[in-house]
Amino acid sequence: MEPSDAARPGPGRAFRGLSPRLLLLPLLPVLLGRGLRAGAAASSGAAAEDSSAMEELATEKEAEESHRQDSVSLLTFILLLTLTILTIWLFKHRRVRFLHETGLAMIYGLIVGVILRYGTPATSGHDKSLSCTQEDRAFSTLLVNVSGKFFEYTLKGEISPGKINNVEQNDMLRKVTFDPEVFFNILLPPIIFHAGYSLKKRHFFRNLGSILAYAFLGTAVSCFIIGNLMYGVVKLMKIVGQLSDKFYYTDCLFFGAIISATDPVTVLAIFNELHADVDLYALLFGESVLNDAVAIVLSSSIVAYQPAGLNTHAFDAAAFFKSVGIFLGIFSGSFTMGAVTGVVTALVTKFTKLHCFPLLETALFFLMSWSTFLLAEACGFTGVVAVLFCGITQAHYTYNNLSVESRSRSKQLFEVLHFLAENFIFSYMGLALFTFQKHVFSPIFIIGAFVAIFLGRAAHIYPLSFFLNLGRRHKIGWNFQHMMMFSGLRGAMAFALAIRDTASYARQMMFTTTLLIVFFTVWVIGGGTTPMLSWLNIRVGVEELSEEDQNENRWQYFRVGVDPDQDPPPNNDSFQVLQGDGMDSVGGSRTKQESAWIFRLWYIFDHNYLKPILTHSGPPLTTTLPAWCGLLARCLTSPQVYDNQEPLREDDSDFILTEGDLTLTYGDSTVTANGSSSSYTASTSLECGRRTKSSSEEVLERDLGMGDQKVSSRGTPLVFPLQENA
C-alpha cells in the first residue's frame, strides 16, 4: 500500500524545520560581492571627483599665473616706453652729442632682456618632450588624446635640440616674445600712414624724380648687389665648414631685399631739430618712405619665385619675368587700393554731416585708414604700400573735408600712435637679442653683410646721383651724396621683415644679422649725424614757417635758382639777391612747357575735377564740365563752393602753384605773376610778366632737368615770396 500524499515529504517541508539564518548562507557570497563592488565604485567615484577637482584647481592656478605673467610683460614694455619718453624730454634740455634717444631705447631693451634672460627662474614640470614619427611636415594643429580627454595644440615653430631645456622652459621669455604678425598688423600701419599723412608734398614733389629713382632703381640695385655678395659669403662658409644647413641663392636675394629697406628715423629726427636743408631732408625722407614699400614688395616677389623642374632654386627666365610681373602687380594693386580707400573716405566726409560730430568723424577717419592695410593684406596685396598712398590721398583730399577739431585730432592721434609704435619696436629690438629663441650667430656672415650693405649703398647713391645730375639743373652735390650714403640706417621695416619668417636655418641667420646691423647703424650712424653735418658743411638752421603762419597766409621766401649746397646769400626785408645770369633764366624758361607737361596736366585735372568732386574746394563743376553734364555737376559740387569762390586750402597740399600764389618784390615795386605791377614802369612790368608766364610750373621743374627756375629783372636774379597753402 502506497503512502498517502500527506505522508510524502515535499521540498518545502524538508527544510521547514531549519533556521531562516541558515537559509541565507548560500546568498552571502553574492551579497558580499555586490557590496564590495558598490563600495569600490563609490570610492573610485570619490577619487575621480577629487582628481577632477584637483585638475580644475591646477588649471585655475595656471590660468592665474599666465594672466599675471601677461600683465608683467605688458607692464615691462610700458615702463620701457615711459623711460624712453622721459629720456627724450631730458635730451630736449641737454643733448648728448654722440647718442640719440632711439639708440638709448634699444639700450634699455637690452638691459631688460638681460634681466629676463638670466634673472627669471626657469619653470619645470610643465613641458614634456614626446617622440613621434610623421611622413609629412609638422602639423599646424595637433589633437592629443590623454586618458580619454582631447587637448588641442598649435605649432609655434621648430626648436633646436640644444635649447629645449634652456630658453623654452622659461614662461616669462615666451610671454615677451610677440607674434611677428603683431608688428605687421598693429605696429607698422600707424608708422607708415603717418609718413604719408604728414608728408610735406611741396618739397617731396619738387624732388619727385630723384626720389623715385633712389627708391625704385636704387633699392633694386642694392638688393641684387647685396644678394650676390652674400651668395659668395655663403659659398665661403660652406668651404670652411661653418654652414650647417641649406642656404640658397634665393635666400641671399631675400636678405638683400629686406636689408635694403632703409629707415633713417634717427637722422631725420636730428635734421628736423637742426632745421637742415629741406631738399636733403626731402630726398632722404622720400627715399625711405618709398624704399620701405619697394623692399617689402620685392621680398614678396623673390619668395614667389618658383622655377620649373626639380631644382627649385635654379635660374629660370620664365620664373624671373613672372616674379617681375608679380612685383608690378602687387605694387600697382596696393597703390590703387590705397588711393581708392582715400577717395571713398573723402566722399563720405564730403556728402555727410559728420563734421557736426568731430568724435564720429575722427573715429571713422581712423578706422577707414587702418582698414586699408588689412584690406590690402586680405586681398593678397601689400598693406604697407596701400596705407602709405592712402595717407597721401587722405592728406590731399579728405583733410579738406574735416572739421577744424577733427583735423587737429587726426594729426595728433596718428602722431602719437606713430611715436609709440616706433619706440616700442626699437625697445623690442634690444629685448629680442636675449629673449628670441632662434638666434644663429655666424661671424663670417655678419662681417660679410656689413661689407655688402656698404658696397650696395655706395652703388645705390653715387652712380644714380651722377645720372640724375645730368638732367638736374640743381645738382645733388657731393656733400649731399656723402650724407645720403652715411644715412643708410636700417630700422623698423628691416626688423619686421626679418622676424616675420624665422622657420628655416637661413632665415634665423638673417634675422640675427639684421638685428646686429640695426644696432650698429642706429648707435654709430645715428650718433655721428651731427658731426657729419658739420664736417660736410651742410647748412642747418633753415627756418620754415609754422603751420599757424601758413594758415594765416603769411609770406615765405623761397629760394629759386640757387644750388642748395651753397650758403644762403645776404638778404634784406624786401628781396633776396641771388648770384646768376638773367639770360640763363630766359633760356631755361623756354623748356618749361616741354618738360613739365605731365605735371601741368595732372594739376589741371586735379584742380578742375578731382578737388571739386572730392572736397569742398576748387571751381564749381558747372563751370568745368561740359553742359550735358550739368545735372551731375550740380550733384557733385559742394554748396560751399558757390558760397565762397575762393578755394579752401590745405596744409602744404598744392605742389604746383597757381598764378595768384606768386609775387615778385623789387625795391618798392610789386609784380604779380600775371604781369600787373604797382609803383613800377610799364616796360618792366611787361618784362616780368613774360618771365613769369609759366610760374605755376616753376616749382615742378626743379627735378630731372625741368627747366631753369631763375627769375630776373634788369640782369639781377630775384627770389620771390610764395604764399604757402594753408
From Swiss-Prot:
Residues 675-726 are annotated as: Disordered. Keywords: Antiport, Cell membrane, Endosome, Glycoprotein, Golgi apparatus, Ion transport, Membrane, Phosphoprotein, Potassium, Potassium transport, Sodium, Sodium transport, Transmembrane, Transmembrane helix, Transport. Residues 676-685 have a biased composition (Low complexity). Pfam families: Na_H_Exchanger (PF00999). GO terms for cellular component: membrane; plasma membrane; recycling endosome membrane; trans-Golgi network. GO terms for biological process: regulation of Golgi lumen acidification; regulation of pH. It catalyses: Na(+)(in) + H(+)(out) = Na(+)(out) + H(+)(in); K(+)(in) + H(+)(out) = K(+)(out) + H(+)(in). It is a multi-pass membrane protein. One of its GO terms (molecular function) is sodium:proton antiporter activity. Residues 43-70, 117-175, 232-251, 299-323, 437-443, 500-514 are lumenal. Interacts with SCAMP1, SCAMP2 and SCAMP5; may participate in its shuttling from trans-Golgi network to recycling endosomes. This is Sodium/hydrogen exchanger 7. It comes from Mus musculus.
